[in-house]
Amino acid sequence: MGQTKSKIKSKYASYLSFIKILLKRGGVKVSTKNLIKLFQIIEQFCPWFPEQGTLDLKDWKRIGKELKQAGRKGNIIPLTVWNDWAIIKAALEPFQTEKDSVSVSDALGSCIIDCNENTRKKSQKETEGLHCEYVAEPVMAQSTQNVDYNQLQEVIYPETLKLEGKGPELVGPSESKPRGTSHLPAGQVPVTLQPQKQVKENKTQPPVAYQYWPPAELQYRPPPESQYGYPGMPPAPQGRAPYPQPPTRRLNPTAPPSRQGSELHEIIDKSRKEGDTEAWQFPVTLEPMPPGEGAQEGEPPTVEARYKSFSIKMLKDMKEGVKQYGPNSPYMRTLLDSIAHGHRLIPYDWEILAKSSLSPSQFLQFKTWWIDGVQEQVRRNRAANPPVNIDADQLLGIGQNWSTISQQALMQNEAIEQVRAICLRAWEKIQDPGSTCPSFNTVRQGSKEPYPDFVARLQDVAQKSIADEKARKVIVELMAYENANPECQSAIKPLKGKVPAGSDVISEYVKACDGIGGAMHKAMLMAQAITGVVLGGQVRTFGGKCYNCGQIGHLKKNCPVLNKQNITIQATTTGREPPDLCPRCKKGKHWASQCRSKFDKNGQPLSGNEQRGQPQAPQQTGAFPIQPFVPQGFQEQQPPLSQVFQGISQLPQYNNCPPPQAAVQQ
C-alpha cells in the first residue's frame, strides 16, 4: 500500500516527531507504527498532502472527508487510522484562532515548555537544585497559510530528535563559531549567545552555546547613514532592541537560511550588501519649510528635497509588465507615464528603474538612446536665445557636480523636465530581441485592414523613427492618404487639403473611412456594380473611348457630337428644294445625296449599282511557254499549234491579235 514503511518514516520523520510531542502534551500516546500506517493511507488517498506536514485544521478535516469517500468506494480503511486521525484533529483544535489558523509560536512554546518540564524532572532525580529554562520566541507568521516549514524544521526538529536520543552532536563553547561570519555583512551575522544559567548535564554533554540564524526576511539591518541629515529608514524605538532577543539557548540550524522572495528582493539585498545605503530611496519630494526669522512677506518659501521610496508592489508590477507584455506595450507606456509625471525623478532614479525592469540588452539600448537624446538636447540649449545653462553632465547625472544624489536632488524643474522627456523618448526606442523597426514608407494598409489599425501602426513607426514632432505630424498625415488602400483613398480624397483649421486631420480621415470594409459597404458596392452606378452618380456603360470625339463612356454610334451633326445636316438639307435636276440620274429634282436610282435617263446602269459578273480565275504567267497536255495516241490527230492560231486569227474579232512567238518560230 503506497510507499514502504521505511520511506514513509524517512519522509515524514521530523513531522512525526512533532506530532508525537503534540499528542504527548495532551496526554495521549500513539505508537510510531500507527502513525506510519496513518501516513501511508494519507499518501495513498491524499496526494496533495505536503511533505513538511501541516498544522491547519482545515487540511485534516479535508483528509477525513477524502478518507470517508475512499471508504464508500470499497477501500478498506483500518480502524486505527480513524482513531489516530481523530486524535490528531482534536489535538489541533485548541491551536485554531477565530480565523481557523494555527499560531505556530504558541504551538512551539507549549511544546518546548513540556520538554522543559520533562527535562527538569529528569535532572532533579540526578542532581538537586538544577534546572533549565527555555524561552520560546515567535519566529514565523501568525497564519499557517504563510508558514515557512523549512524554518520550522530548523527550530523544532533537532530538539525533538534530541529528546528521542538521536539529536545532533552539541558543540562546546570553544569550538562554536558563527556560521558564515567571514563573508556576511554586519546586519546578517548569526547571533551567538551564552546560556543564562549553566546546566550540569552528564559528562557526554558539556555546557554548550547554540547559534541562532534568523531568516533573511526577518534579519535586522541598521538604518543607513544619510548624506542629507535624515536616515533612509526609520530608526528603532528607544528602550528596546531592534529585533526580538533570541532565546538563551538555541539549536544549530540543520539547513542554511531560506532565501525566499522575488528577484526584486534579491536585488535589494545585493545592493545593501554592497554598501549601497541609498538604493531604492527615490523619488525626490519637495516639502516647504517654515519661514525663518526675518523673512519678508511675498518671499518664496524655502523648499527641502527629500526621498520617498517606491512601493515594492509597483516595482514588481514594472518587472512583470516588461516581461509579459514588452517595454513598449500600451500597458507599460501608461504605467511609465504615470510614474514619470507623478514623481520628480532624477537621473539616478531613471537608471535604477531601468535596471530593475529591463533585461541587459534592453538596458543597453535605453542607455544608448539616453546619451543620444542628451547630446541633441544640449545642442538645443546652446542654440536657444538666451542659452539654457543645462549641460550633458547634469542630464546624465555624472561628473563632479552631478554624480551624487544630494547634488541631483537640487536640480531645477527645467532640468527635471528635460531628463523626463529624454528618458521617455529613449524608452520608446527600445526594441524587443529579434524585432526591427520598419520604415514609415513601407507601412501600407491591407485590403481588409481597418483604417484605424493602419493609422496606429503608422504613428507607432513614425514615433520611433522621427524625432521632431512637427515633422512627424506632417509625415503621418501624408502617408495616411498615400499608403491607404484604394477604397479609403477614394473616401479621403474629398477631404484632402480641405480640413478646417483647428481640426485634427487624422481624426477626420478616420471618420471618413468609418464603415469601409464592412458588410454594409460591401453590399453597397455590389448594388452599384449591378446597376452601373458609382459613388459619383455617373453612368458607365462602356469603358473605352469614342472613335469620333475621343471621350470615355460611349460608342461612336451613340456619340452625341455625331448625332448633333446629322441632325444639323438633315435640318439644312430638308429645309430647301434642289435648284436643278439630279446631277447623277438626270431624271428628277432631288439632291445627289438622296438619289436612289439604278439607271440614268438613257437606261444605262449607274456606277455603284451595276451587278458584277462571275469572278474569273487568275491567269498564270511565267518564263516558260505553255505547252498543252496531249494524251498519248492523239498526237498525230492533233493539228499543229501554228495552224490553230492561224485559224483563230482569221476570225473577225481576232484580226488584230498577233500570233504567239512560238507559233511564228515553227
Swiss-Prot record:
Give start-end positions of each zinc finger (CCHC-type): 544-561, 580-597
What Gene Ontology terms describe what this protein does at the molecular function level? nucleic acid binding; structural molecule activity; zinc ion binding
Q: Which GO terms describe its biological process?
A: viral process
Which segments show compositional bias classed as Polar residues?
A: 604-622
Lipid (N-myristoyl glycine) attached at which positions?
G2
Q: Which PROSITE patterns match?
A: ZF_CCHC (PS50158)
| Disordered, as annotated region | 165-205, 217-264, 598-641
For this protein, the record's PANTHER family field holds: ENDOGENOUS RETROVIRUS GROUP K MEMBER 24 GAG POLYPROTEIN-RELATED
State what protein this is by name: Endogenous retrovirus group K member 7 Gag polyprotein
Q: What is the scientific name of the source organism?
A: Homo sapiens (Human)
- Please name the gene that encodes this protein: ERVK-7
